[in-house]
Curated annotation (Swiss-Prot):
Keyword presence, 4Fe-4S: no
Organism name: Pseudomonas aeruginosa (strain ATCC 15692 / DSM 22644 / CIP 104116 / JCM 14847 / LMG 12228 / 1C / PRS 101 / PAO1)
Protein name in the entry: Endolytic peptidoglycan transglycosylase RlpA
Sequence intervals crossing the membrane: none
GO molecular function terms attached to this record: lytic endotransglycosylase activity; peptidoglycan binding
Mode of membrane association: Lipid-anchor
GO cellular component, as recorded: cell outer membrane; plasma membrane
Keyword annotations: Cell membrane, Cell wall biogenesis/degradation, Lipoprotein, Lyase, Membrane, Palmitate, Signal
Coiled-coil ranges (or none): none
Lipidation (S-diacylglycerol cysteine): 27
Top-level taxonomy: Bacteria, Pseudomonadati, Pseudomonadota, Gammaproteobacteria, Pseudomonadales
Amino acid sequence: MSKRVRSSLILPAVCGLGLAAVLLSSCSSKAPQQPARQAGISGPGDYSRPHRDGAPWWDVDVSRIPDAVPMPHNGSVKANPYTVLGKTYYPMNDARAYRMVGTASWYGTKFHGQATANGETYDLYGMTAAHKTLPLPSYVRVTNLDNGKSVIVRVNDRGPFYSDRVIDLSFAAAKKLGYAETGTARVKVEGIDPVQWWAQRGRPAPMVLAQPKQAVAQAAPAAAQTQAVAMAQPIETYTPPPAQHAAAVLPVQIDSKKNASLPADGLYLQVGAFANPDAAELLKAKLSGVTAAPVFISSVVRNQQILHRVRLGPIGSADEVSRTQDSIRVANLGQPTLVRPD
């Protein structure tokens, strides 16, 4: 397991190694049923979270999770020097020419929902990554050199800070690359120029508005207060919530009346489909904040598995569909596709 610590915190180590609140590979032996999976997980230390990390207890079809869409960043990037564990790092201002080969690890449930180094929220189902010196945000292509699989991720966090690890990926990204079970992989990391990426697809890069300075100023005190509260809390013993524990397989009953009551007229978009209902609800909440179109979850059974599909509609016109798709892509929430209502 790689060791990772958020640059803004100085935390005590787990497993009795003194300072530096990081996720320790030596702790992986305490998860006897899944030692291989635990071996590559890492994450930013946080007093308010349990000290063990891991994969979700439920199975996730990551093939349905789209890669991050490279978006031009209008405004300043987070590239200030910082010191962690006595070492000072000097982030780059531009990731486009970045090339590196090394070991990748991943981090998961412990940090799901927590703030990243640039103030975003870590989502273990998102296609994101942590890096020591790339600007935040930036985009990179990560290729597993053992199997040739490749993904695009948005870099929005700092780490990993120990051993030979060059990048930490989200659980979803690691699983798409085929190394979530083994923990680490030898990868190639390549910076992406968003403008060039869009040009290669015959489309101009979407315009992204910079965040108002007033909003940034208002968010700073709240973030500092949240961080202070987190640092005052002790490390807890990890006990997964009851809803996360594996449960017996029960017959699935879908509320067909609820699904059938949806309007049949108009156009519909689907942004994702999840085996985990919590993931569907999370995406639904995010989509509701970026589009005026109705967002709903339609559940179906496929191959003896329940799928919770996150959809939008009805949408009145093709032009409105196009604008809605662009808004969702700009927000980096997925690749919405047209579907028929059912």
